[in-house]
Amino acid sequence: MKAQDTLTVMQYNLLYYGNYQSGYADCYETNNNTQQKDEYIRTILDYVKPDIFTVCEFGSTATLHNDFLRHNLNIGSTNYWQTDNILNYANSNIINHIFFDSRKLGMKKHVALRTTPRDTDIYELYLKTPGLAAGDTTKLICIVAHLKAGNTASDRKKRLNQMQTTMYYVSQHYSKDNVLIMGDFNLYGASEDTYKLLTQTYSDPDALFKDPLYEVGGVGEWTYNSQFAAFHTQATRRYSEECFSAGGLDDRFDFIMMSYEVAYGYDHLRYVRNSYKAVGNDGKHYNQSVNQGSNTAVPTAVADALYGCSDHLPVTMKIFADVSVGVDETTEPDLMAFVAPNPVKDYARVSFYNPKHGNVQFDLYSLQGQLLQRTTEAFDEGPQQFELSLQDQPQGFYLLKITHSNGWRQTVKVVIK
């Protein structure tokens, strides 16, 4: 992988790929044929060209992931796609899985959390960068989850329980890392407790995720709501055809969320703004099939493949990687900023190292990126402390961006109780 590169990530619910044993939702080989799906998948992969490809509703047969590699990824002269062994503690007939470009990425670890109704899979990847041999490792954690379907109180509670287990694991192991959480979340709106847990209410602010669609108006009560037509991911078909859900595009069930490390590029990886897409959603197919008439988002062959392969659309995003080696570290001094104690009440005691006499600006942001207050003070060189008044701010989670007049900056998370 080059010192500066861009990774494309794709998450896709493959609709009972390679599994017919249960007849789930009337899905059989006759109406959800794996060989036919492979043709559609190859068309979609050739269009998106992902570097990381995560999936839900993948059959749990032991050899299926190798067959998938051979038929869809490592074809012709291509031989660099890899995957990992299946873990399936829940003994489900459909599982999550991952495929990745081994020229750019390696896998250090795969953990499956014992959640209900299916395992939550955590893949710890690392970038194969120029500095890797010297021990300079940049990690990217991909968490793939398929939450309980349905909109009853019991369904919502099961989704919440699964993500509470997951968030605790993130808090304990990956709270300062580059993390993506993706999958079919079956969420009906941003007011659902599970969505709020992931983005706002979990007790450890370092474990929270950011929804890439917040900044472009994609967060709200999206189900059966034409105002969110550009963001829906299900269903690809207007009319019921046994295995496939019907109704056209009117739900946002499929997600990739990112840790704030990825959102703001704290650790060599940074989300490319406005790169998040539901592949094939042109905003003009609300309650319609994705290939009805013309589709301005993708070529006709891709729209037809999306219609044929699954009742979900894949979602994608791009991540810029800057892992340059040999940089003079003195050009970017570490402010070593932290807030302690944290949570805070009326004031935040900010400790930091000032590399050079000058003005330092303190900007407080909401988790959604809204600037709430700005304070600027002059500081001498050396260790510093500053009492930042937060009396006008309600309880919640915030981001404090600290910027020196020379351009050196750092962002820390703050909890007001």
Feature-to-residue mapping (PLM):
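C-terminal tail/sorting-segment detector
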Residues: 379-381, 395-417
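Surface-exposed loops/turns
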Residues: 345, 356, 381, 394-395
